[in-house]
Regions:
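Conserved helicase NTPase motor core
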Residues: 16, 42-49, 95-197, 212-216
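Conserved helicase C-terminal RecA-like lobe
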Residues: 94, 279, 293-305, 318, ...
Length: 422
């Protein structure tokens, strides 16, 4: 988005530049009332939906650590990437426990709907449902955009492609950028056939091959071209670069991670020892996932070589940030039990699992969200008095903050600061 602003200037503020999920969230804030959701519905991230799936599995008499929990999460994701909700699934008799999977999937959806929440996959699926079943809404949004540009098109899955087609039917100019050779998200539903099928689906398609590479040197591109040439189902093209020189590509294979680490650290010592200009801060080791660092760290430490690990959690994935956001999710959506469960003991209010189960049970019986329920607990509640006092203090703090937000007489940042430090 920042790059677009630099290229086109202030007029960039009139553009919609976002991901599929961000666009659908924006769409649903306006149109989800058609499905019975308020504009303030909650959006569950992967951690939130994972906890809800665990809860469903536990209620089905499984343990959180049982393999079926991970299997259920993967099952739900696969089905949603195909655009299938529980009622759309035809149970496969050869899939040993699919009937149980569908039942747990259905319970996951029920809990999520009761909490007026959607997960990331819902954002696209519910947008699709509205566009397909409410022609006046589809026309309103498809005529809004005369030009639709899709980047990294090779990573598009079937439901995203259906969304693109629904938004581009009314004289919309469709422009896609993608490289079938870079399809790396098939595990997440990306379908390479979509981009390869474009010439057939759009007979007037104008195809522009961009094959000059500005990042790599010739030795790297020669290896890449040679490897990818073995794939016969592709758009033929050879990458080239105007950059001269470049070191040859070296490929090594090891039977153990420790052997790999030993080799890499040996090479680091060779490089550092060749020249006074070659300092350790100019050398980087890249890895695919953070768990792979262990043998490298062990070997570097063993030899007394200095190193730093870069990376870690994104800002919005940090615990303290998610805790604060959970408080505000409860304020705008009192039915968001997932957010409430996260903050009820942050900071510690000494509310144990048994007391929390009582809250859940009584709130469910009252057909209320957990926060809605603790705002007006009936006199015959089984919640212990000590817990009621702690909950009362929580409600008082939340409602005071809500009043300040609704008055709109102060900067949100000031209210947030007071809320955190209080």
């Amino acid at each position: 988005k920042e790059r677009v602003e630099k290229l086109v200037g202030s007029s960039a503020s009139f553009l919609t530049v976002c991901t599929f999920h961000s666009f659908c969230a924006r769409f649903l804030r306006r149109e989800a009332y058609l499905l019975g959701f308020p504009p303030s519905f909650s959006i569950l991230d992967d951690e939130d939906s994972g906890k809800l799936i665990q809860e469903v599995a536990v209620e089905a008499n499984y343990k959180k650590s049982d393999p079926i929990v991970k299997e259920l999460r993967s099952y739900i994701s696969r089905k949603k990437n195909k655009g299938e909700y529980p009622d759309d699934i035809k149970v496969n008799p050869f899939y040993v426990n699919e009937k149980e999977m569908v039942d747990m999937y259905k319970e996951y959806e029920r809990k999520k709907d009761n909490a007026l929440s959607m997960d990331f996959d819902d954002l696209i699926l519910k947008t699709l449902y509205i566009l397909k079943n409410y022609p006046e809404v589809r026309q309103k949004w498809s005529t809004r955009y005369k030009h639709l540009l899709i980047d990294e098109f090779q990573d598009t899955n079937n439901v995203q492609y259906e969304l693109i087609n629904l938004l581009s039917v009314d004289n919309t100019n469709l422009y896609v950028v993608g490289d079938p050779d870079q399809t790396i998200y098939t595990w997440r539903g990306a379908n390479q056939k979509i981009i390869l099928d474009m010439p057939r689906r759009y007979p007037d398609l104008e195809d522009v091959i961009l094959n000059e590479n500005y990042r790599s040197t010739s030795p790297i591109l020669n290896v890449a071209n040679s490897l990818i040439s073995h794939n016969k189902k592709r758009v033929p093209k050879d990458l080239f670069t105007s950059q001269s020189g470049g070191l040859p590509v070296i490929v090594k294979s090891f039977s153990k991670a420790e052997e790999e680490a030993d080799y890499v650290v040996n090479e680091i010592e060779k490089i550092a020892g060749k020249s006074s200009d070659a300092v350790y801060s100019n050398i980087a080791v890249l890895y695919r996932s953070s768990y792979l660092t262990r043998p490298f760290e062990a070997e570097l430490a063993h030899r007394g070589l200095p190193y730093r690990i870069f990376g870690g959690l994104r800002f919005y994935q940090r615990k303290e940030v998610k805790d604060v956001l959970a408080y505000f999710r409860v304020l705008v959506n009192p039915k968001d039990d997932i957010a409430f469960d996260r903050i009820v003991n942050v900071p510690s209010r000494k509310i144990g699992a048994a007391s929390l189960e009582i809250i859940k049970k009584e709130a469910t019986e009252a057909k209320l969200g957990e926060y809605e329920y603790i705002k007006n607990v009936p006199s015959d509640s089984e919640i212990p008095n000590r817990i009621l006092v702690a909950l009362g203090a929580l409600v008082s703090k939340m409602e005071k903050t809500k009043e300040r937000l609704q008055e709109r007489s102060e900067a949100y940042s000031a209210i947030l600061k007071d809320f955190i430090t209080d």
